[in-house]
Amino acid sequence: MKISVIIPSLNPDDKLVSVVDSLVKKGFEDIIIVNDGSDSAHLWPFEKVGSYSQCTILTHEVNKGKGRGLKTAFEYCLKNRQGYDGVVTVDGDNQHRADDIYNCCEAMVKNDKVVLGVRRFDGEDVPFKSRFGNNMTSMVFKVMCGLNISDTQTGLRAIPYRYLDTFCNIEGERFEYETTMLLEFKKSDIQFMEVPIETVYIEDNASTHFNPVKDSIKIYKVIFKYSFSPTVVKYILSSLASWVICLLYTSPSP
């Protein structure tokens, strides 16, 4: 497999080094880390992994958001990684195990689909805000967008190379970008599948830069904007018309 691992990172600690070490040990040979405007006190992890032959560091001088970080890496791969099977996006806080990352990449290559590494949210160690947020968003996705995705917040996503250009040209610069990516599955008829992964929360997910209020508002704004787009409204009306016709033809005669 020829895979680029993409890790967007803001103010990382030693967990980023642990993630990269585990990837190198697993045999990944191309790891792209995006420094999204980290402050001077948090540059040492980038300097550490930047010395590895497997790693490339891309830098934003100021913080631009996770979405822009992913786009920066996608654009880099389009220019410099032609002929690769694809990329896999990974969080830098050690929540994704190297074995799970490898399994998602294998599934992507075998099935030629986007692969989402999905967690279970019924364990006692899962923070309440993560369980509630994912369950709520999954329900909204299913009801309003017609997408059945069990883990809408997963950062572990293996993406075939041919989709990178599409994902470079969709809206979103921060956490809402990952939601827009999922909505693009339906809009552009992108095939996807889910692969179960280990559910890991370290220090109650304390290292996350996700703002529960501000970022959630942005995410739901994206979902509702999509839900009332002309394409989806047309789909809903078409489905409603089909349902009415079905009722008319299956109702017993008076």
Feature names for model-found ranges:
Residues 29-38, 58-60:
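Short beta-strand/loop segment that forms part of the nucleotide-sugar
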Residues 84-93:
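Short beta-strand-to-loop acidic/aromatic patch adjacent to the donor-nucleotide binding site
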Residues 249-254:
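Conserved small/polar residues in nucleotide/adenosyl-binding loops
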Residues 61-64, 68-79, 98-175, 202-210, ...:
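Acceptor/aglycone-binding surface of glycosyltransferases and processive sugar-polymer synthases
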Residues 35-44, 94:
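A conserved acidic beta->alpha catalytic loop
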Residues 11, 36-38, 64, 73:
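Conserved short acidic donor-positioning loop in nucleotide-sugar-dependent glycosyltransferases
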Residues 173, 183-200:
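Catalytic donor-sugar/metal-binding loop of nucleotide-sugar-dependent glycosyltransferases
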Residues 11-25:
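Short, well-formed alpha-helical segments that are part of the catalytic scaffolds
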